[in-house]
């Protein structure tokens, strides 16, 4: 059926900020879909609150609204734009929930807007646990025995009839939020109570646990003519019981017989047909390893994390085709863009193995609960492609960037057998490494399979890796063993370690004997048809399919997996850099390992290498492609860390040179540079051990800010107020050494702001200054940033511009740089300089209309700012106010403290823009799901040093009609200054403490600050946790609370007697 002509204008809903469970895969899907609809001639309107995405660029849709994805704002845009149809299936759970809400509130009927892709009834059937159960029974598809409950007591009663363990799944939540596995009644009560609160319909499904079954996923497509096909099946390494987003996954599935595959394939196709989904859909099934029994676990009636993985694993562009199907085209009418000759009705065939490993945030959250279960915890993932399981698994391990280059963590050798086996059985994020260690200790695959229910097939592969390690150890410099190791994905570094030599020597030996990788094409059809995709992976074999072109090329390094501190913002910069390289007439080559992102979409660059970002893997591509040079400044710390080894190997680094990158990163060189440029910085010193640190701090005076050099996202950074805390930090938080000194700086409590600048070596363009709402001490990635600045004097702004120019020229910056300043008493100090693109590039690019990464790339390739039409200095500021606000994923991470400090904790961001500061703030808070009603109670629990300031906030809250509650000390302080607050207990006062008030819904906001001694704050942590679990707005910085107050004051009415 040809495409529909009765609709002209389509609105697409994006997925909003990045949180755990909903990451960059939706930027990829949304970008694909918008371009796909425009290609068919429709007018596209996009709504998304996340500025750090490619999809919110002006050229992706005809009209782009960066506004909160809430009923209030989406309705406004619908009424203004009057689209004919709405496509919600590309915005993740956010998009689906928004569509449901618009429908329930009658907005879609009122404006006669049609839903495309998935009908509401299908969303309901797939998402509502009761309707799903009915549908499966009608289709005679088996599902685990289960019961829908609305109260904790109902849950306990049902569990008693089927027996433990049981699984709790809240309805309409994302990434398993609030769910979990319960082994007994105590756990069941706890998890159900929390799950009911987090479910928007206060409903949970309690089901029999089928933990230990194989977890298999099918990614299916269907069109309006009822053509349906399987794009790809995937098998989890971890059995059922661990969220698929936290599991290691292989595609295609490896351990099923043909009969089992056909059985599950038929089930998946019958489900998508019954739901009448037009587009993509993901079906998760559990297969009993010992019989042909299977259960349907769940269905996602939308494009998901797994579809991004399936798209990248097969090359089959699911989101692009889902958008075309949504407007009436059928699979037998659309050409598969990969081959350019076959139709999309072909099921992809793979002649390789893909491995996906999740990336977890526990390097940032040392206290976080690492046990894996049905609630997702990973922030991102890596994917690797190889010709066998060993190769793809080991390539994925070294893509993770957790300091490993093989499936082993050396420290585990010291773990006792008992502790090892406990970790093997009770899965945490690093289970793969524990299982590998167990095999190295001689546990057999059979024994481990019995303990873990991991298929013996995979454990045999881990055993094979260990056997090759032993071969290598026994035969140093043996070329045959070297070839075997390379065929199985071993890195030069691992081989060097086993041979007692250096990586360089192994590389030399390989090159001399022509043991080099070949690059194979990902073509969706196992080389059956000719293909034109420039999408490659490396393997050791024969016939290289990646042919170097005659055009001069530039290699751009991506930023790897998404993690806290290095998010989708860097992918945004990478994609823009590629556009500029192409515009300058070069061939653009991308190298990256993240399957969720736009940069790994093969249609973005001229060539895509899906490879780990390590020195060895990058050099292999450089040896083949011989590019003009490599651009490292857009790939975050990942790419910057590769600059030095690459330069040593004779590779041309384009943009700021390695020596100058060093001057910004190395403390002593940086101080030297600032002295020469006559720019003040807070007094500080470096220390290589505990005594030196204590001495430095005495000299500078407390409080001090301590941190390791060379890190991103403020890892292991702390503000310490006394020597005792400092010594404990030096002992536990860092491994200080002469090679890795610790920086000790005077901590200045002032106004913080930051600048992104672009330099061509002579002139410096400063697109804008962003002022932070939270004062210094909260990581810049967790602060709310305002552009243009609201409180900085003209003089301070001029000083900032002057220092920025001096630094850019003095440090020989070519391209992008980011500088952070702190201002106290009108004096400007430089805190740090990053000679690369930073996480504020997308936000600032959007609000100033300067495509910063593109401009920077053109300068790197030799153009000047004046040639591009930009003037030197600070760019004229916008008349509107724009705010970038952080978004956190604390609900997903048990035991992680939500207190903000110098170590970054946010996973994503939103933007609010309007004519005034208050309106922009309102939008930013709404978009980041911090909604405060206009009346209610606010509770204060405040450290001594901030009580004075909190008193003023409390008075203002009272003036707009809020009730004030406070803990004992705070209430006494308020009372002594004439403000009566209702006292509440901290913790343990049964019905009168803060958590119980929170549970009863009597508190609308919590303002909690922490004093200088952070250790004694367990009560505070429990209070903060209760706020997170019940969705009560929590402010741990008074500046954020003050910003929220401004919003409330601007919306409140004055009530006065005449």
From Swiss-Prot:
It catalyses: hydrogencarbonate + L-glutamine + 2 ATP + H2O = carbamoyl phosphate + L-glutamate + 2 ADP + phosphate + 2 H(+). Mg(2+) 3 binds at residues 820, 832. PROSITE patterns: ATP_GRASP (PS50975), CPSASE_1 (PS00866), CPSASE_2 (PS00867), MGS (PS51855). Mg(2+) 1 binds at residues 284, 298. Residues 1-401 are annotated as: Carboxyphosphate synthetic domain. Disulfide bonds: none annotated. Keywords: Amino-acid biosynthesis, Arginine biosynthesis, ATP-binding, Ligase, Magnesium, Manganese, Metal-binding, Nucleotide-binding, Pyrimidine biosynthesis, Repeat. Residues 930-1058 are annotated as: Allosteric domain. Gene3D superfamilies: 3.40.50.20, ATP-grasp fold, A domain (3.30.1490.20), ATP-grasp fold, B domain (3.30.470.20), Carbamoyl-phosphate synthetase, large subunit oligomerisation domain (1.10.1030.10), Methylglyoxal synthase-like domain (3.40.50.1380). Residues 547-929 are annotated as: Carbamoyl phosphate synthetic domain. Mn(2+) 3 binds at residues 820, 832. Mg(2+) 2 binds at residues 298, 300. ATP 1 binds at residues 129, 169, 175-176, 208, 210, 215, 241-243, 284, 298. The keyword Ligase applies. Residues 133-327, 671-861 form the ATP-grasp domain. Mn(2+) 2 binds at residues 298, 300. Residues 930-1058 form the MGS-like domain. Large subunit of the glutamine-dependent carbamoyl phosphate synthetase (CPSase). CPSase catalyzes the formation of carbamoyl phosphate from the ammonia moiety of glutamine, carbonate, and phosphate donated by ATP, constituting the first step of 2 biosynthetic pathways, one leading to arginine and/or urea and the other to pyrimidine nucleotides. Composed of two chains; the small (or glutamine) chain promotes the hydrolysis of glutamine to ammonia, which is used by the large (or ammonia) chain to synthesize carbamoyl phosphate. Tetramer of heterodimers (alpha,beta)4. Belongs to the CarB family. This is Carbamoyl phosphate synthase large chain. It comes from Streptococcus pneumoniae (strain P1031). The gene is carB.
């Amino acid at each position: 059926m040809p495409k529909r002509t009765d609709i002209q204008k389509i609105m697409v809903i994006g997925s909003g900020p990045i949180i755990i469970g909903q990451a960059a895969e939706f930027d990829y899907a949304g970008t694909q879909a918008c371009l796909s609809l425009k290609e068919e001639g429709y007018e596209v309107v996009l709504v998304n609150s996340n500025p750090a995405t490619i999809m919110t660029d002006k050229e992706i849709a005809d009209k782009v609204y960066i506004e909160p994805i809430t009923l209030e704002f989406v309705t406004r845009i619908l009424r203004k734009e009057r689209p004919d149809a709405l496509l919600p299936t590309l915005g993740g759970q956010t998009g689906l929930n928004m569509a449901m809400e618009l429908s329930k509130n009658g907005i879609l009927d009122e404006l006669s807007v049609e839903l495309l892709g998935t009908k509401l009834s299908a969303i309901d059937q797939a998402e509502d646990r009761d309707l799903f159960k009915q549908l499966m029974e009608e289709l005679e598809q088996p599902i685990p025995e289960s019961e829908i409950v609305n109260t904790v007591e109902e849950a306990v009663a049902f569990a008693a009839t089927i027996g433990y363990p049981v699984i709790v799944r809240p309805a309409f939540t994302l990434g398993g939020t609030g769910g979990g596995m319960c082994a007994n009644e105590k756990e069941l009560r706890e998890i159900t109570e929390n799950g009911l609160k987090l479910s928007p319909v206060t409903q949970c499904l309690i089901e029999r646990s089928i933990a230990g079954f194989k977890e298999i996923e099918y990614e299916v497509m269907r069109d309006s003519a009822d053509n349906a096909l399987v794009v790809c099946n995937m098998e989890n390494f971890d059995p059922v019981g661990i969220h698929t987003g936290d599991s290691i996954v292989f595609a295609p599935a490896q351990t099923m017989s043909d009969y089992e595959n056909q059985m599950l394939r038929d089930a998946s196709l019958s489900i998508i047909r019954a739901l009448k989904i037009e587009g993509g859909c993901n079906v998760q099934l559990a297969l009993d390893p010992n019989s042909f029994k299977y259960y349907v676990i769940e269905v996602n009636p939308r494009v998901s994390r797994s579809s991004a993985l399936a798209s990248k694993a097969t090359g089959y562009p699911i989101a692009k085709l889902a958008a075309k199907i949504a407007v009436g085209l059928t699979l037998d009418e659309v050409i598969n863009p990969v081959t350019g000759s076959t139709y999309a009705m072909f099921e992809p065939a793979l002649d390789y193995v893909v491995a996906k490993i999740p990336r977890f945030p526990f390097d940032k959250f040392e206290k976080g609960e690492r046990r894996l279960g049905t609630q997702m915890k990973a922030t991102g993932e890596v994917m690797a492609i190889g010709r066998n399981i060993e190769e793809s698994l080991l390539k994925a391990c070294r893509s993770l960037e957790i300091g490993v280059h093989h499936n082993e963590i050396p420290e585990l050798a010291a773990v006792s057998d008992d502790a090892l086996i406990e970790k093997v059985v009770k899965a945490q994020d690093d289970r793969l490494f524990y299982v590998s260690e167990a095999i190295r200790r001689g546990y057999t695959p059979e024994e481990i399979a019995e303990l873990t229910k991991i298929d013996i097939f995979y454990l045999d592969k881990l055993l094979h890796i260990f056997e090759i390690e032993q071969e290598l150890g026994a035969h140093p410099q043996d070329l045959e063993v070297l070839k075997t190791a390379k065929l199985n994905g071993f890195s030069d570094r691992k081989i060097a370690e086993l041979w007692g030599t250096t990586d360089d020597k192994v590389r030399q030996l390989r090159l001399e004997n022509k043991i080099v990788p070949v690059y194979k094409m990902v073509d969706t059809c196992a080389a059956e048809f000719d293909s034109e995709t420039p999408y490659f992976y490396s393997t050791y074999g024969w016939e290289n399919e990646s042919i170097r072109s005659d055009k001069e090329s530039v290699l751009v390094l991506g930023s790897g997996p998404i993690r806290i501190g290095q998010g989708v913002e860097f992918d945004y910069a990478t994609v823009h850099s590629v556009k500029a390289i192409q515009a300058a007439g070069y061939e653009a080559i991308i190298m990256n390992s993240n399957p969720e992102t736009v940069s790994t979409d093969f249609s973005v660059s001229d060539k895509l290498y899906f490879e780990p970002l390590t020195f060895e893997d990058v050099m292999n591509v450089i040896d083949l492609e011989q590019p003009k040079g490599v651009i490292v400044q857009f790939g975050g710390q990942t790419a910057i860390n590769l600059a030095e080894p690459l330069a040593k190997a004779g590779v041309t680094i384009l943009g700021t040179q390695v020596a100058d990158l060093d001057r910004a990163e190395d403390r002593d060189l940086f101080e030297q540079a600032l002295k020469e440029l006559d720019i003040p910085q807070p007094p500080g010193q470096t220390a290589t051990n505990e005594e030196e640190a204590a001495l430095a701090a005495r000299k500078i005076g407390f409080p001090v800010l301590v941190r390791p050099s060379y890190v991103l996202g403020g890892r292991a950074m702390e503000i310490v107020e006394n020597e005792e805390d400092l010594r404990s930090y030096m002992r536990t938080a860092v491994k200080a050494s002469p090679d890795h000194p610790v920086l000790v700086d005077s901590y200045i409590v002032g106004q913080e702001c930051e600048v992104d600048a672009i330099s061509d070596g002579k002139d410096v363009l400063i697109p804008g200054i962003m002022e932070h709402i939270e004062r210094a001490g909260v990581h810049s990635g967790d602060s709310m940033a305002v552009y243009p600045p609201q409180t900085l004097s003209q003089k301070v702004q001029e000083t900032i511009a002057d220092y920025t120019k001096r630094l850019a020229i003095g440090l020989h910056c070519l391209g992008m740089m980011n500088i952070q300043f702190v201002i106290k008493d009108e004096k400007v100090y430089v805190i740090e300089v990053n000679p690369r693109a930073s996480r504020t590039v997308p936000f600032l690019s959007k609000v100033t209309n300067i495509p910063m990464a593109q401009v920077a790339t053109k300068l790197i390739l030799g153009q000047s700012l004046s040639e591009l039409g930009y003037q030197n200095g600070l760019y004229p500021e916008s008349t509107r106010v724009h705010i970038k606000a952080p978004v956190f994923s604390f609900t997903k991470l048990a035991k992680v403290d939500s207190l903000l400090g110098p170590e970054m904790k946010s996973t994503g961001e939103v933007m609010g823009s309007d004519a005034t500061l208050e309106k922009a703030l309102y939008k930013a808070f709404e978009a980041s799901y911090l909604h405060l009603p206009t009346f209610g109670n606010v509770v204060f629990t405040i450290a001594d040093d901030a009580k004075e300031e909190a008193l003023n906030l409390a008075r203002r809250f009272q003036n707009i009609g809020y009730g004030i509650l406070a803990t004992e000390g705070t209430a006494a302080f308020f009372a002594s200054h004439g403000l009566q607050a209702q006292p509440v207990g901290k913790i343990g006062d049964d019905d009168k403490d803060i958590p119980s008030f929170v549970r009863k819904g009597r508190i609308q906001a919590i303002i909690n600050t922490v004093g200088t001694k952070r250790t004694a704050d367990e009560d505070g942590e429990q209070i903060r946790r209760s706020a997170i679990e019940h969705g009560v707005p929590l402010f741990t910085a008074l500046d954020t609370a003050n910003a929220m107050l401004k919003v409330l004051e601007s919306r409140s009415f004055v009530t006065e007697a005449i």
